[in-house]
């Protein structure tokens, strides 16, 4: 989020904020030695965050800044008085940058409609901005921490030594991880802040996909891990860099006490309920560290942040001397002001820098003309993990003293001044080359004597590969997360403690693809040398499976050629123990199976794991070869037990098909069947063709396998249990499997028999098998399907006239898309041709007459019917055409006195509405009449603010008209009437849960009648 460059934004408010003590419902302070390895998995991340300083559990939010109860006490905010409930759909937590404001202004989204989502039981998000108590009262313009200024007494909010340990949650992709690392390297490059992978540090940040969008606390919270939320649409470089600004200790720039001298807040343009985001801090309680107001700060809001409309300003910069208004809200890079503030906040040395290139050099200030007295410089050399740094001093002339007490250059093997010392140097003797054990070096120069020398000059080079003799670490391709360099060859020899194995897991993988990995590749071998057994030769974009060596050594080689370069790879290695080799075999009753980082127990055939995951009990499921029988959930007819996994494999004779009919069905579950479920597949393997995953209380339809095998799997979780299910299976011979059942065209298997069908343009002979040429008038009422010219795919016959009358569900337009088209060519299509009409017959307006070999563009009717007529003359014949008919929702509807129907989707009644639906209907009545809309059925995914799926009604022709309401759940409680002659209906769905939809009826009505009925 933007920052208050103020020291109170950075020091008084940052350093004065007390440490949280269980604020926001957090758990007890975790042990400093706690193991957070669970963060490698998504579920582990979410569970561990229950015990974190979680910004999504903050008392309130100030923009994307999380404030806890102690912050409120510091600001003297009485929640009951100063905070009010959120009353409108919130925009959600964004950083207020330019790119976000642009992305939030899609054509069909109003300023009041946008929102982020908060997770429910199924991990989905719900639209909300603030947790209770809500937003700051709009009347409040400033707030003040009325405590004595203590710039140095609250250092617990500053990260010690500028070192910020981090963990990246396991639910992020490789590209997202790369963005996080690029943003951290950006901060390191321009400041003296350092980000390190967390080992055993007590306080650290966790990149997590949280429910509150983009948000973070300001500064170090202390007492354990704290989350930095990178939620939906937050995984952009500038947004992550902005959030890291909060972690470093920055508030929003526009909240500085002196902001009114530089910008104007236009309050009438601010979305209702968002006024608190524009509060400012009080002068006298904060300090700006001597830095001027920074329009260019990455911590500044954009001009239209939280605006009622995209083109309305909420923050207007004042004109400069040339009459130009500065640009604000950039999310591209740190500004010079950001850099200066951070360097002051963390007391960065006046000289020195962070060096991140593969090669580079640096020297003492003034070299070779002499360095000044009392100089202090620090160079932080940081290359890609898995690389080492070779440092060479080529010139050395420093005042020499005993133990190099006065003037010296010091090199440490790590990221800070507490790292192991490689050497302290003075005098004129050039040191031997120094080599780091990892990817960082700390070089510090100090002078305190009055006798000065020329100084020193040093050059460094990153070398990839080498020996990695430790129990855990990280290896990345050179220059990761940026593209690796050409013509590289890196060899790593990993050795962990005796008695352990080497475990290797990949976080990201993107190496130039080739079928045999001939160009760029990563090679992994099970041992210490190139002659060791090959584990894998990897390239492409899929992460390799986890690797486990058979000894305590592993050999890796990365090679790139001279051309195409990709992002490369990032991998973690660690010591791995085989728990199954222990005397008790891990406590497993039957079999122990070692896994990377852990182990699991398994049971012999006919048994399954008990609830303790170690003991075995008689299994449910089994291998069934009977032609018919019954399958029930374990414990039937009582409730099934928790943590069960049952698999039935049903096998019938060849040429048979298996049908499964559920008689009783009652499982825990919601629409996504995440908890308890039954899966049915055609085949015996767990990845065979899936017919469906079922849960809840709705009985599935009869399922028929595609072969003579069927797999039925039942799973229950560790919580709610229900009655379960009872199903009957029966096998039937598939007469179509041999010689197509004797059918000339298509054979369709039915239970106990079969039937023949004919292709388009033919009808079934009375013998039930042969097909004869049929008449050519077709009526089509299916939602989608294929139609073709007669005799397709062969040439159409001469002297034929065929018609197709296509009708669709009320409120849905017919769409026709041609896959192939070849009809005798004529300039005016006078011979053979296809005509399309916008209605039910040839009296409707014509949409076009077509011939030749150019496919007509996809055509959409204005209503729910389309008429086609194909004509061929006596001479030339061609291949003809094939087209797909489908439907599109929305359009213009005419309201009349006679009642008409409107359905949410074309398959209403047969299937739930589809995901990502975008439908707008405009219903228009005659002059002097209004529109009356009543709902016969309404079942749309329910959410407090209708932020997922919803139906909206507007009193006019488009969304600029007054909105009559947004509805979800069970819908409107009464009829909807327009005040004018038109009504717009908008239907939107998201990408997950789908419901039945709605069925509405509309008619025209006199205005006075409608008003009377409303009364």
Swiss-Prot record:
Prodomain positions: 26-149
SUPFAM superfamilies in the record: EGF/Laminin, Metalloproteases ('zincins'), catalytic domain, Spermadhesin, CUB domain
This enzyme's EC code(s): 3.4.24.-
Domain Peptidase M12A: 149-349
Omega-N-methylarginine sites (modified residues): 963, 966
Binding site for Zn(2+): 242, 246, 252
Domain called EGF-like: residue spans: 576-617, 732-772
Disulfide bond annotation, renumbered to this chain: 192-348, 212-234, 214-215, 351-377, 404-426, 464-490, 517-539, 580-592, 588-601, 603-616, 620-646, 673-695, 736-747, 743-756, 758-771, 776-802, 829-851, 889-919, 946-968
Gene Ontology MF, one: zinc ion binding
GO BP: cell differentiation; collagen fibril organization; dorsal/ventral pattern formation; negative regulation of skeletal muscle tissue growth; protein processing
Cofactor binding note of this UniProt entry: Binds 1 zinc ion per subunit.
Cofactor needs: Zn(2+)
Ranges of compositional bias, category Polar residues: 103-113
Any single Pfam family the record assigns to this protein: EGF_CA
Residues with glycosylation annotation: 171, 361, 392, 628, 805
Keywords: Calcium, Cleavage on pair of basic residues, Developmental protein, Differentiation, Disulfide bond, EGF-like domain, Glycoprotein, Hydrolase, Metal-binding, Metalloprotease, Methylation, Protease, Repeat, Secreted, Signal, Zinc, Zymogen
InterPro entries according to UniProt: BMP_1/tolloid-like, CUB_dom, EGF-like_Ca-bd_dom, EGF-like_dom, EGF-type_Asp/Asn_hydroxyl_site, EGF_Ca-bd_CS, MetalloPept_cat_dom_sf, NOTCH1_EGF-like
Residue stretches of biased makeup (Basic and acidic residues): 115-125
GO cellular component, one term: extracellular region
CDD domains noted in UniProt: CUB (cd00041), EGF_CA (cd00054), ZnMc_BMP1_TLD (cd04281)
Enzyme class: hydrolase
Stretch forming the signal peptide: 1-25
Region annotation (Disordered) ranges: 24-49, 88-130
Domain CUB: from-to ranges: 351-463, 464-576, 620-732, 776-888, 889-1005
Function, as annotated: Protease which specifically processes pro-lysyl oxidase. Required for the embryonic development. Predominant protease, which in the development, influences dorsal-ventral patterning and skeletogenesis.
Name of this protein: Tolloid-like protein 2
Organism (species): Homo sapiens
Organism ancestry: Eukaryota, Metazoa, Chordata, Craniata, Vertebrata
Gene behind the chain: TLL2
């Amino acid at each position: 989020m933007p920052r208050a460059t103020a020291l109170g934004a950075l020091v008084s408010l940052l350093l004065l904020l007390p440490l949280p003590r269980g604020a926001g419902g957090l758990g007890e302070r975790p042990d400093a030695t706690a193991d957070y390895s669970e963060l490698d998995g998504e579920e582990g991340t979410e569970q561990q965050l229950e015990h974190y300083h979680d910004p999504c559990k903050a008392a309130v939010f100030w923009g994307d800044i999380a404030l806890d109860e102690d912050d409120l006490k510091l600001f003297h905010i009485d929640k009951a008085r100063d905070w009010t409930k959120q009353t409108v759909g919130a925009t959600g937590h964004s950083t207020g940058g330019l790119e976000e404001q642009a992305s939030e202004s899609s054509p069909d989204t109003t300023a009041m409609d946008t929102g982020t989502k908060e997770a429910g039981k199924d991990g989905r998000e719900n639209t909300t901005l603030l947790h209770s108590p809500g937003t700051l009262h709009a009347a409040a313009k400033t707030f003040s921490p009325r405590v004595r200024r203590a710039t140095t007494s609250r250092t617990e909010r500053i990260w010690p030594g500028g070192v910020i340990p981090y963990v990246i949650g396991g639910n992020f992709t490789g590209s997202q991880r790369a963005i996080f690392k690029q943003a951290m390297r950006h901060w390191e490059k321009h400041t003296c802040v350092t980000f390190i992978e967390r080992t055993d540090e007590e306080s650290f940040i966790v990149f997590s996909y949280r429910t509150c969008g983009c948000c973070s606390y300001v500064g170090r919270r202390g007492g354990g891990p704290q989350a930095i939320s990178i939620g939906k649409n937050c995984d952009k470089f500038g947004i992550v860099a902005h959030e890291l600004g909060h972690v470093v200790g920055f508030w929003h720039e526009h909240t500085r006490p002196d902001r009114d001298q530089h910008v104007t807040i236009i309050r009438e343009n601010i979305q209702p309920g968002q006024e608190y985001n524009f509060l400012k801090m009080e002068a006298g309680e904060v300090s700006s560290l001597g830095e001027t107001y920074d329009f260019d700060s990455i911590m500044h809001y954009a001009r239209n942040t939280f605006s009622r409309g995209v083109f309305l300003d909420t923050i207007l910069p004042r004109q400069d001397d040339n009459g130009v208004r500065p640009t604000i809200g950039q999310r591209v890079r740190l500004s010079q002001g950001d850099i200066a503030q951070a360097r002051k906040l963390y007391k960065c040395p006046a000289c020195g820098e962070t060096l991140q290139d593969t090669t580079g050099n640096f020297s003492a200030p003034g070299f070779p003309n002499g360095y000044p007295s009392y100089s202090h410089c620090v160079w932080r050399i940081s290359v890609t993990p898995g690389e080492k740094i070779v440092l060479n001093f080529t010139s050395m002339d420093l005042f020499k003293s005993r133990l190099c007490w006065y003037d010296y250059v010091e090199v440490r093997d790590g990221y800070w001044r507490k790292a192991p010392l490689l050497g302290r140097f003075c005098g004129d003797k050039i040191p031997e080359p120094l080599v780091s054990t990892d990817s960082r070096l700390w070089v510090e120069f100090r002078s305190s004597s009055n006798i000065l020398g020329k100084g020193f000059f040093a050059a460094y080079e990153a070398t990839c590969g080498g020996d990695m003799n430790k129990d855990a670490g990280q290896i990345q391709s050179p220059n990761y997360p940026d593209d690796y360099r050409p013509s590289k060859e890196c060899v790593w020899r990993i050795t962990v403690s005796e008695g352990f194995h080497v475990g290797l897991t990949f976080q990201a993988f993107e190496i130039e693809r080739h079928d045999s990995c001939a160009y760029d590749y990563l090679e992994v071998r099970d041992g210490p040398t190139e002659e060791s057994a090959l584990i894998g030769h990897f390239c492409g974009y899929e992460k390799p499976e986890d690797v486990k060596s058979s000894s305590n050594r592993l050999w890796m080689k990365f090679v790139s050629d001279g051309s195409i370069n990709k992002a490369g790879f990032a991998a973690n290695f660690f010591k791995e123990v085989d728990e199954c080799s222990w005397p008790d075999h891990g406590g497993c009753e039957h079999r122990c199976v070692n896994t990377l980082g852990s182990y699991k127990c398994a049971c012999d055939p006919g048994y399954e794991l008990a609830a303790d995951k170690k003991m075995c009990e008689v299994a449910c499921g089994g291998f069934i070869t009977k032609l018919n029988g019954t399958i029930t959930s374990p414990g039937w007819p009582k409730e099934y037990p928790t943590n069960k996994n049952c698999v039935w494999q049903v096998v019938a004779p060849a040429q048979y098909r298996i049908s499964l009919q559920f008689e009783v069905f009652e499982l825990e579950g919601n629409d996504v069947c995440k908890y308890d479920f039954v899966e049915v597949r055609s085949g015996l393997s767990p990845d065979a063709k899936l017919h469906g995953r079922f849960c809840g209380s709705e009985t599935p339809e009869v399922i028929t396998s595609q072969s003579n095998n069927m797999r039925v799997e039942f799973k229950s979780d560790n919580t709610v249990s229900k009655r379960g299910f009872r199903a009957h299976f029966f096998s039937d011979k598939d007469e179509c499997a041999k010689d197509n059942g004797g059918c000339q065209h298509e054979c369709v298997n039915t239970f106990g028999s079969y039937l023949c069908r004919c292709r388009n343009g033919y009808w079934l002979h009375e013998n039930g098998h042969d097909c004869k040429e049929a008449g050519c008038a077709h009526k089509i009422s299916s939602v989608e399907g294929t139609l073709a010219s007669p005799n397709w795919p062969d040439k159409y016959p001469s002297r034929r006239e065929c018609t197709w009358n296509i009708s669709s569900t009320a409120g849905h337009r017919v769409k026709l898309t041609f896959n192939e088209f070849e009809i005798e060519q004529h300039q005016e299509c006078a011979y053979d041709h296809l005509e399309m009409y916008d209605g039910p017959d040839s009296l409707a307006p014509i949409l076009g007459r077509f011939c030749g070999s150019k496919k007509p563009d996809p055509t959409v009717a204005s209503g729910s019917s389309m008429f086609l007529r194909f004509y061929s003359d006596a001479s030339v014949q061609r291949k003809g055409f094939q087209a797909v008919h489908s439907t599109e929702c929305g359009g213009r509807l005419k309201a009349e006195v006679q009642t008409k129907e409107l359905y949410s989707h074309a398959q209403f009644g047969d299937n739930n509405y589809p995901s990502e639906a975008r439908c707008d209907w405009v219903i228009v009545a005659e002059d002097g009449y209004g529109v009356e809309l009543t709902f016969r059925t309404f079942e749309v995914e329910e959410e407090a603010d209708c932020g997922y799926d919803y139906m909206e009604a507007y009193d006019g022709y488009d969304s600029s008209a007054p909105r009559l309401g947004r509805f979800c759940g069970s819908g409107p409680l009464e009829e909807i009437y327009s005040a004018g002659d038109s009504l717009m209906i908008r239907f939107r769905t998201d990408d997950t849960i789908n419901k039945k939809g709605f069925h509405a009826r509309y008619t025209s009505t006199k205005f006075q009648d409608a008003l009377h009925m409303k009364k």
